[in-house]
UniProtKB/Swiss-Prot annotation:
Name the UniProt record assigns to this protein: Tyrosine-protein phosphatase non-receptor type 6
Catalytic activity: O-phospho-L-tyrosyl-[protein] + H2O = L-tyrosyl-[protein] + phosphate
Alphabetically ordered keywords of this record: Cytoplasm, Disease variant, Hydrolase, Isopeptide bond, Nucleus, Phosphoprotein, Protein phosphatase, Repeat, SH2 domain, Ubl conjugation
Biased composition (Basic and acidic residues): 558-589
Domain Tyrosine-protein phosphatase: 244-515
Region named Disordered: 536-595
Main location: cytoplasm
GO cellular component: alpha-beta T cell receptor complex; cell-cell junction; cytoplasm; cytosol; nucleolus; nucleoplasm
Function: Tyrosine phosphatase enzyme that plays important roles in controlling immune signaling pathways and fundamental physiological processes such as hematopoiesis. Dephosphorylates and negatively regulate several receptor tyrosine kinases (RTKs) such as EGFR, PDGFR and FGFR, thereby modulating their signaling activities.
Amino acid sequence: MVRWFHRDLSGPDAETLLKGRGVPGSFLARPSRKNQGDFSLSVRVDDQVTHIRIQNSGDFYDLYGGEKFATLTELVEYYTQQQGILQDRDGTIIHLKYPLNCSDPTSERWYHGHISGGQAESLLQAKGEPWTFLVRESLSQPGDFVLSVLNDQPKAGPGSPLRVTHIKVMCEGGRYTVGGSETFDSLTDLVEHFKKTGIEEASGAFVYLRQPYYATRVNAADIENRVLELNKKQESEDTAKAGFWEEFESLQKQEVKNLHQRLEGQRPENKSKNRYKNILPFDHSRVILQGRDSNIPGSDYINANYVKNQLLGPDENSKTYIASQGCLDATVNDFWQMAWQENTRVIVMTTREVEKGRNKCVPYWPEVGTQRVYGLYSVTNSREHDTAEYKLRTLQISPLDNGDLVREIWHYQYLSWPDHGVPSEPGGVLSFLDQINQRQESLPHAGPIIVHCSAGIGRTGTIIVIDMLMESISTKGLDCDIDIQKTIQMVRAQRSGMVQTEAQYKFIYVAIAQFIETTKKKLEIIQSQKGQESEYGNITYPPAVRSAHAKASRTSSKHKEEVYENVHSKSKKEEKVKKQRSADKEKNKGSLKRK
């Protein structure tokens, strides 16, 4: 991602940033202070930082040897995807895993960060409203930006999609311009100016900025600013709506994409097992009870779905959840069958048994100090511990036909969720999840965490999404990109209706903002206790990969930028792109060696 490019960062500053906010495998790119026009790749290796020089010859990018690439983005993508290629002279493998992104240049929601021109066109054309616009990063020139605007004219002729105009925004000396004499202090100032005046294309036609296309992606470390933006009221003809309402309404409209089959829950023999007749599990992700008589229709049914963070790679995510409805009298035995077959060791209950006089969940555990039989299993409640926010029960479960096989299960019941709405502040929920995760991580062979409320979608979805986002940030670092709306869409594709209300949607934002703030403070304390020292790394290439891949040429770039519609003169930076610095290059060719 181009947002790993930090235009104003020195080597010592890069080390401080990577050690203070990154994790092993975090990396960033920055301009070289030694050779103008070159770049440096700074990578955290365990607790240290190594710096790799990147040559920009004017025709290609490389590491003073090895593969050659058309763009800086392609070079970084290659070494990110081809793990094990880079190593220090001492043989230490240098892994590029997690981009440490720079802060967004603006908190405005029309800023989309790292998307390609093609992706921008797809978004704007799907919107279909002429003069809708967004701002994104330039893939071809790190540190610059692109203003993409949907025109009012078809791209190729009648019936074709509307044309999208891409206008490059250069950043020079901390000021922004589309060319010519007009410069601005910020992207926001530039956009606000051209919203009033329009932008004249080379053809003489004007491009207008009338309707922003809002993004939901945000740099995790900047989420507090996004919360402030979303809290702002947007004036309309009849009422003022905040950004949270807009985002949640947009999310609700996309539910039509999740029309997966729910046939098992609709079968007559299973209707009595559903707490709410229309809240049913998707067939493709439902938990199927094992060891049941196939001659008994519906015997393998329970209203529960597997949920996984599909936005993380398989090597980044080891956690699976089961989102379930609260137990009915008729489903308690099935619930314990599910817990046993899945080897679940942690159960999270986010409701009281009765709230406002309404039954939310049948108690499916015995009283403390007692034992009960549930179907094929014996369950003992050996201990209960009360805290200000939740109750922890320590349970033992064993099959009736093998009493010597005993598993311990920790049952966390959150008691501080109000009957309506959400908690007034997220600290209690974050502490609750921290305890749950510590327990789960202490059990290396434990199965999925079962999470339930009453219907198994509202509070359940909120808790799961918060935990997923916390895990992503903990894995990738504070400066990773997160997308709360996209995360909810992803879990809704696995269980219908997850995260039910705008209040729950906003609570996720507020919870993650507090998690980020707390994590920053912890990292500052840790970093203040560590020393810092590093130097430029000397990179070698393992023999097996020295020439295993074809070299990329300038003409083979995957990131072909669109024709930019800028008028006026070229920027000074563009005029310098093709200049050679052969004398400087010769001095640095010794910084890499082949094994």
